[in-house]
């Protein structure tokens, strides 16, 4: 089957005419709807791009705010740690000072107690010695001494004893 040139040109004209008629019909009846769909889709894409840009900007702002909050929290934590160290040091120094004061107070009290015990012991020894001196004097003199003589004798003996 061979197609002649005339048939080929006829087919060409028929197909071209059909395409032109089809395009005219599409333009008359469907082109508005197609153009409306394409316009709507274009607007939707434009809105989606704008929303994506706004979301990106919002995310950047949120990230910056979160970073600022994190930095502030780190700074506050560092300050709290620093303050706690300082308070600990002050309390330690205070405890050491209190312990030192308590040790000094106890030492002074011990020294006072020692002095008091020494004084009590010396007083007891003096009393004992005065009694022994009176007994000795009575035996030596063979008689009881009156109070004044006894007192003078005791004082003189104690003075001699204190110097020794």
From Swiss-Prot:
Superkingdom of this protein's organism: Bacteria
KW Nucleus (keyword) present: no
One function term, GO molecular function aspect: proton-transporting ATPase activity, rotational mechanism
Transmembrane segments: 6-26
Main location: membrane
InterPro entries the record matches: ATP_synth_B-like_membr_sf (IPR028987), ATP_synth_b/b'su_bac/chlpt (IPR002146), ATP_synth_F0_bsu_bac (IPR005864), ATP_synthase_B_chain (IPR050059)
Disulphide bridges: none
Location within or outside the cell: Cell membrane
Keyword NAD: no
CDD domains: ATP-synt_Fo_b (cd06503)
A cellular component annotation (GO) from this entry: proton-transporting ATP synthase complex
Pfam families, sorted: ATP-synt_B
UniProt keyword list: ATP synthesis, Cell membrane, CF(0), Hydrogen ion transport, Ion transport, Membrane, Transmembrane, Transmembrane helix, Transport
Membrane topology: Single-pass membrane protein
Subunit structure as annotated in this protein's UniProt entry: F-type ATPases have 2 components, F(1) - the catalytic core - and F(0) - the membrane proton channel. F(1) has five subunits: alpha(3), beta(3), gamma(1), delta(1), epsilon(1). F(0) has three main subunits: a(1), b(2) and c(10-14). The alpha and beta chains form an alternating ring which encloses part of the gamma chain. F(1) is attached to F(0) by a central stalk formed by the gamma and epsilon chains, while a peripheral stalk is formed by the delta and b chains.
UniProt record similarity statement: Belongs to the ATPase B chain family.
General function of this protein: F(1)F(0) ATP synthase produces ATP from ADP in the presence of a proton or sodium gradient. F-type ATPases consist of two structural domains, F(1) containing the extramembraneous catalytic core and F(0) containing the membrane proton channel, linked together by a central stalk and a peripheral stalk. During catalysis, ATP synthesis in the catalytic domain of F(1) is coupled via a rotary mechanism of the central stalk subunits to proton translocation.
Entry protein name: ATP synthase subunit b
Species for this entry: Streptococcus pyogenes serotype M4 (strain MGAS10750)
């Amino acid at each position: 089957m061979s197609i002649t040139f005339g048939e080929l040109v006829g087919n060409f004209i028929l197909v071209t005419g059909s395409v032109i008629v089809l395009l005219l019909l599409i333009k008359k009846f469907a082109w508005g709807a197609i153009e409306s769909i394409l316009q709507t889709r274009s607007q939707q894409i434009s809105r989606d791009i704008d929303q994506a840009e706004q979301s990106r900007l919002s995310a950047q702002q949120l990230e910056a705010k979160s970073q600022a909050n994190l930095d502030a929290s780190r700074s506050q934590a560092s300050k709290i740690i620093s303050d706690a160290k300082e308070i600990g040091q002050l309390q330690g120094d205070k405890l050491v000072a209190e312990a030192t004061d308590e040790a000094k107070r106890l030492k002074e009290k011990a020294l006072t107690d020692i002095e008091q015990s020494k004084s009590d012991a010396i007083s007891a020894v003096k009393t004992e010695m005065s009694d022994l001196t009176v007994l000795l004097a009575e035996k030596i003199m063979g008689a009881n001494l009156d109070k004044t003589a006894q007192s003078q004798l005791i004082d003189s003996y104690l003075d001699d004893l204190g110097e020794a």
